Regions:
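Short, well-ordered coil/turn segments that N-cap beta-strands
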Residues: 11-16, 43-45, 68-72, 109-113, ...
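N-terminal binding-site loop/beta-alpha segment at the start of enzyme catalytic domains
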Residues: 1-73
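Active-site mouth loops of central-metabolism enzymes
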Residues: 17-30, 81-97, 238-241
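Structural motif corresponding to the early beta-alpha repeats
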Residues: 66-94, 118-119
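Conserved, mostly hydrophobic/aromatic
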Residues: 6, 18, 47, 60, ...
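Structured C-terminal cap/extension of enzyme domains
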Residues: 38, 45-48, 64, 180-305
Length: 305
């Protein structure tokens, strides 16, 4: 496992962070703890609690108790709570503070290294909620405040200077919007976490062909002359690279971005976890970076057209 500095926090974070989400939490406390332990054995020291299931916090605390707390980096998603019909969005100060205190009580972690607001809209986060989070930080209950999302409100939140961390989608298909947002975060010395690094539209050759075929059909109707770039680029090579899966390529590409401290990985499958943790120590095959850039260029050209 490789490790990277995390913004201005002074923390050294593993290149991969295990997300403890609903899928693994539904399998019970013992299996959740076993997966966290497996991640620890692979050298992962970052863990993100994404689920509101109480058993998840219990399991994470149980598994992490074997290591010194200072060697670990544990974060919590905020902005969702349990309602009568399931999860509901809730960025009220009461909900945020309750989520933090419940997680700390169940996990016995002492403090959370990071709390992350999950994709808040521009008018969705009251000022008093931000004040409540700052009070938790002042009290030593949390260390860093972060914001995650892909909507345009992220730019407004970054401009406030109130946050230490940006969690953002970043993949082989990401464009200038994501890159500019990451650059703005770097200029503020923020830590950057990446997620959604394997876009759904790329997870099978059939999906890639469907999307790219639709684009070829659309642009063929716009132009009378043949497109000089037709047949060049495209992402089908992701599923034709020897000794690499498309998922592994996409993860490895995201980790080539120097601004990204860690990529979130979410799986309940121990075998898949074993596969993913091997990626940070691998180098992309020669020429693959150029293929990715050509595919990005072709996709960007089609969107601009």
């Amino acid at each position: 496992m490789r490790y990277r500095p995390f913004g201005r926090s002074g923390v050294v974070l593993s290149a991969l962070t295990l997300v403890v989400g609903d899928e693994i939490a539904r399998r019970g406390q013992d299996k959740t703890a076993a997966l966290v332990t497996q991640a620890l054995e692979h050298g992962i020291n970052g863990f993100h609690i994404k689920t509101a299931e109480p058993d998840a916090a219990l399991a994470v605390g149980q598994a992490l108790a074997v290591l010194e707390r200072r060697l670990l980096f544990v974060s919590l998603r905020l902005g969702f709570g349990r309602g009568r019909t399931g999860l509901v969005r809730d960025f009220s100060p009461e909900a945020l503070m309750q989520a933090v205190e419940q997680t700390l009580r169940l996990s016995n972690l002492g403090h959370l290294d990071l709390v992350i607001l999950d994709d808040p809209g521009e008018e969705e986060l009251p000022l008093r909620s931000l004040t409540a989070l700052k009070s938790l930080r002042s009290a030593g209950r949390v260390t860093l405040l972060g914001v995650a999302g892909h909507n345009d409100a992220m730019d407004a939140y970054l401009s406030t200077g109130a946050f230490d961390v940006l969690a953002t989608p970043y993949s082989v298909t990401s464009g200038w919007k994501e890159r500019n947002r990451m650059r703005a975060a770097v200029e503020q010395d923020m830590g950057i976490l990446a997620y959604d690094w394997f876009p759904e539209e790329l997870n099978s050759p059939q999906k890639i062909e469907k999307v790219e075929g639709q684009k070829r059909s659309f642009f063929g109707k716009l132009f009378k002359e043949p497109d000089p770039f037709e047949g060049i680029g495209g992402y089908s090579f992701l599923h034709r690279t020897s000794n690499w899966t498309a998922e592994d390529i996409c993860l490895a590409f995201t980790l080539t971005e120097p601004a990204v401290a860690s990529a979130w990985i979410e799986t309940a499958d121990p075998d898949r976890l074993d596969q993913l943790v091997a990626v940070p120590d691998r180098d992309l095959p020669p020429g693959l970076g150029a293929q990715i850039e050509m595919a990005r260029f072709t996709a960007g050209r089609q969107q601009a057209g």
